[in-house]
């Protein structure tokens, strides 16, 4: 193995990615009522959602330290790639860059590139898989970086949540008009901007209609979908995720698709019942 891919823990690793030995996770952490929860293999989604529901305080998150990234860069490979949450939404990207600087000051010799996903969750997962795909066909380091950066440019992220409280209270919806959603059961269809911030794309009354609207946006925005993998992450709602996949695949043909349950950070922001789609 001559390369490593580091993905911060907002990006869910599929079973195949975990088994490959190529991927390593840079864990973020969460806090609910002073209780510290690492976003790693010990994360218990059911317990976490229960704690959040019982708390009057908004859960908080913190990103991996530069030193943690530096530790992950130290390995017996020639090329290291890191994939982080959008730099507009988290400090993880800047931590990864600073970790690279610290590592190289210690005479680290590996080639390192940090990808700003401008996304989250399965957006990061797909970028990690794209890196692996490029490496497996024999691209050199510079070709991998160029190809994956171009892939990120074409990627779109969408989500519909039961509530936006955690995103709003943690300042991730800055600049958006206040959304009156709960009283009228209005569900906004949210998406990513090219810069990696969050925008509102649409809205509908009720979750079912909002998910259908989201599927329409996915199909409309898709760039060369027959060459792409559709990824869906759900927070404790597998049937809803399958229904969304069916809705999208009725409208657009893709290379492949997969569904994962949200890990810690994605569970924190998506909340119980949330759906995230990336194509």
Across the structure, where does each feature detected by a protein language model lie?
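Local beta-strand N-terminus motif with an aromatic residue
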Residues: 2-3, 77
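N-terminal glycine-rich anion-binding loop in soluble enzyme alpha/beta folds
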Residues: 3-63, 68
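Repeat-mediated protein-protein interaction surfaces in helical alpha-solenoids
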Residues: 33, 107-112
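Active-site cofactor/cluster-binding pocket
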Residues: 64-80, 84-107
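Mixed-charge interfacial surface used for oligomerization/domain docking
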Residues: 3-4, 10-24, 28-29, 89-92, ...
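A glycine-rich beta-strand to alpha-helix segment
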Residues: 84, 113-114
